[in-house]
Amino acid sequence: MYLSFYITDTKNKLIFQYLLGATAPSFKHLWTRVQSTCPQLLEDSSSDDYLDHSMVGRDLEVYKYFSVINKLNYWCLASTSKSKGPLDCFTFLETIDRILLEYFDKDKLSIKKIVNNYDRISLIFNCCVEAGEPNVSDMLYVNKIKEAVPERSDLSKFISSTAHNLQQAVQLPQQRQQQLQQNQISRGSNSLIENEEIVPWRTSRASKHENNELYVDLLETFHVVFEKKKSHLRLLTGSIHGIVDVRSYLNDNPLVAVKLNTMGNDIGIPSLHDCVEINDGVFSPSNITFIPPDGKFRLLEYSVDLSSQVKQSGVRMNSIGLMSLHFQNGLGKDSDEFELSLNIENFKKVSQVDDLKIDLQFNVENADPNEIAYKIKILRNTHGRFENSIIMGQGQWIFDKSTATGTVPVLRGCIEYENTGPNFTKKVDLQTVSLEYSYIGQSASGIYVEAIDIVSGLTIGKNTKLYKGAKYKTQTGNFQVRL
């Protein structure tokens, strides 16, 4: 049973809290308890000591879910249950994160957005939680939440409107009240007819747009680890996680067909929105038909196992995501220099790579790293700047906000040892290189939207236009090259 929910920033500063009862603790009290009983919950998600849930009292457990998109922490305090595991709570927190994005029609939620809409978010939690349990009815559809929590009204307007209606009801004569009730019943029956649902995730009342618009956004995040073998790279493990989001602003109740060309990739069994029609239990990415919800929603999620595809095809994979990387150790007269070169492929649909950062990890060969003191000195770099870490043996090559495709950035440096004698034989090598970047215009797997068609159910007037299109974005998850 859920007792309370909290939203904090990455430094665990409170932004929002929703308490389901008078006995539910504030985040200040919960924070004190967490500090004393399970401080690992306060660690960053990348830390080795990080915990995502822990007991904080008798029959009390706290969960912490980190939203990668919004860079926010979602906390939940719940009573322990033998019938439910941690996955239930994390799934619900992930669903709440998605609902907030779709409700506000945003790609990312800012702290200011949450603070300015505190009352609406409280009402959204009220819709999604019933008697301390997730509301498993149709309320988890965003269109239902938008009906219960209007986007252009706040809590104060609800209260003032209710008070005004009550005052009018008291002042009206009994005869007038009866007439008013009859009119309300008549209007209510007409309203039910007007707002009759074709599908539970869409109502006709919600679909009143000046123009008809339908946009598909395909985002892929890839995770790969390469091993350097002489002058070649060998894929150790790799996968791609893809999501297809849709922004639909269509009138009436149209039937939409999206054709996805997988370019020979095996996307397995994808996770689908309830709106997707499945014929004879078989899903075909080349013909995805659905009556869309109104606004932003996630159409499907898929995964591509690069490791198995490379193994089955027997084709060597040296690069992915427009990038191929090569580095060498033992260069220079004293064999203490290294060079790293990056080939950013020239692609017609991609003009630039954004937020490129490369982490370098050095290692001492056959020795304890603490026994040798050294620093990294840069001799030449064609792009960006290099920053040494406070941790010895680590540094970061930081590029500008955008880097043009078709370029070959090069970084050359050397290892400067401290307090070395004439018989010093230890060697420091560049061991691991990690890349982080993103780009727009192409997916890493090559998957693309072949067609977006309105099959039926859409009436386009003389002054109404239809706009549709697709956008692609690729970003790195974990991209490593190891020696």
UniProtKB/Swiss-Prot annotation:
InterPro entries: Adaptor_comp_med_subunit (IPR050431), AP2_Mu_C_sf (IPR036168), Clathrin_mu (IPR001392), Clathrin_mu_CS (IPR018240), MHD (IPR028565). GO terms for biological process: endocytosis; Golgi to vacuole transport; intracellular protein transport; protein targeting to vacuole. It is found in: Golgi apparatus; Cytoplasmic vesicle membrane. It is a peripheral membrane protein. Gene3D superfamilies: 3.30.450.60, Mu homology domain, subdomain B (2.60.40.1170). Residues 211-482 form the MHD domain. Pfam families: Adap_comp_sub (PF00928). Keywords: Cytoplasmic vesicle, Golgi apparatus, Membrane, Protein transport, Transport. PROSITE patterns: CLAT_ADAPTOR_M_1, CLAT_ADAPTOR_M_2, MHD. SUPFAM superfamilies: Second domain of Mu2 adaptin subunit (ap50) of ap2 adaptor. Its main location: Golgi. Present with 3410 molecules/cell in log phase SD medium. Belongs to the adaptor complexes medium subunit family. Part of the AP-3 complex, an adaptor-related complex which is not clathrin-associated. The complex is associated with the Golgi region as well as more peripheral structures. It facilitates the budding of vesicles from the Golgi membrane and may be directly involved in trafficking to the vacuole. Required for the transport via the ALP pathway, which directs the transport of the cargo proteins PHO8 and VAM3 to the vacuole. PANTHER family: AP COMPLEX SUBUNIT MU. Adaptor protein complex 3 (AP-3) is a heterotetramer composed of 2 large adaptins (APL5 and APL6), a medium adaptin (APM3) and a small adaptin (APS3). This is AP-3 complex subunit mu. It comes from Saccharomyces cerevisiae (strain ATCC 204508 / S288c) (Baker's yeast).
